[in-house]
């Protein structure tokens, strides 16, 4: 029995001596070094000795390492995101194109246009998206557009509840690498493809400091280049030249509403009371005089939508005129069909874009649509209607002549 005890004692004291004899000293030294290093690092940072100029090139290999890490992070954090079945719907692509032209092209370029010298003077530089989007799947793109990227000029989506808007941007981004300048111009601005001026101007390189920094295929030092522009009054890209909407688009027909309603809606978008990252960007750039001018320009014109009417729906007509009393749903026409009653609060629905109406129903049902002014029972109403009933109401109102009594 003595031998096993001696062996155990050797294991305990010889090979693995007591903690305070072997590890305590080195642990104290390591802790001291860590604290000292942290203090020195904080002192150096606070002193201003380290400069962060965008005019200097990034260290060799840093940009590639950061981009690879960013792509891996986006894939990891987006793997559980559900992709909508209608991701490639034309109306999504069109809406995304208009928003991209307004908000993103100035930094990332666009089909037919390179990147401006101002954007390419950032560090890190924004990539030329038509050339690099193939590295990202739909889920990764959604995560990036919705969340942005820290320590870059890439913002998060301003309205986090509007995932539907983000998916429209993703729908466009997935198709952009395959677009030429003519198709892009038609989608983004509403200009007929045959009149797209940019298509007649082939891209040519321009000289820029550090143009050889990093992989050139990820950036576009070419003219014509996308420019920073104001979104003030930029209505036609989504709503069409006359405000009645665009064929196959999802933006609403503005001409159905009164100037009062349009002005109040722009105010609600600007304040965030009615969440929409797309509309808020435009609305906050408008002065009160701009809002008054735009409301007067589009309001009460009642122009038929370019896509024509859709077939009516008997169930929708019955709900619009009678409601669903058994579930406490009042007739839609009790608010929306009374001319002159609260023009700021109750929009006209007859002849409205069916895609827009369906989307608004979904937003009300999800509790994220917001409101313009005053009393708003729509969240409760949409909860009490089945999806089939909501779709029927949409078909009914979309089938009516523009501006008719609902």
Features from the language model and the residues they span:
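Periplasmic c-type cytochrome electron-transfer domains
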Residues: 4-98, 106, 110, 117-118, ...
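Glycine-rich, acidic and aromatic/proline-enriched surface loops and short helix-turn segments
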Residues: 147
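Soluble periplasmic/extracytoplasmic beta-strand elements of cell-envelope proteins
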Residues: 128-130
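Generic hydrophobic alpha-helical scaffold/packing signal
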Residues: 266, 280-283, 295, 317-320, ...
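Periplasmic/extracellular electron-transfer cofactor-ligation site
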Residues: 97, 101-124, 150-153, 179-180, ...
